[in-house]
Amino acid sequence: MAKVLDLNALDQPILELKLRDDNRTVFRLTVPTVKQYERFISAKSEMSEIAKYQNPEKIKKLFELTAELISCNADYITVTAEELRDKYRLKFGDIVVIFAAYLDFTKEFNNAKN
């Protein structure tokens, strides 16, 4: 007898992120791809250096990576770095907090499946 594993039926782990815009928009973040996860880990290790030296180009790239992170969501909503800064009013400190929470979330997911 054939068995079926339907990945569509599995519940995805979700991290809800509520932003500061007027609508208090909520993004339901999901687990990233392996490539995305590697980029997030790399960026997390650079954050203290970026905060210390305030390099505008690196901060811009960090906002772009955060937009990619937030775009990895259960509702398939894509956001840009510009939207994060302008529409959603994110600051550099918010990025640090989001990354820390997201990495904890992905660690919990990895620990749960092992």
Task: Describe these PLM feature segments.
Residues R20-R24:
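Glycine-centered tight beta-turn/hairpin loop motif at sheet-sheet or coil-to-beta transitions
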Residues A2-K18:
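Short acidic, Pro/Gly- and aromatic-enriched capping/linker segments at domain boundaries
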Residues Q12, T25-N114:
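Short, surface-exposed, charged amphipathic helix/loop patches that serve as local interaction elements
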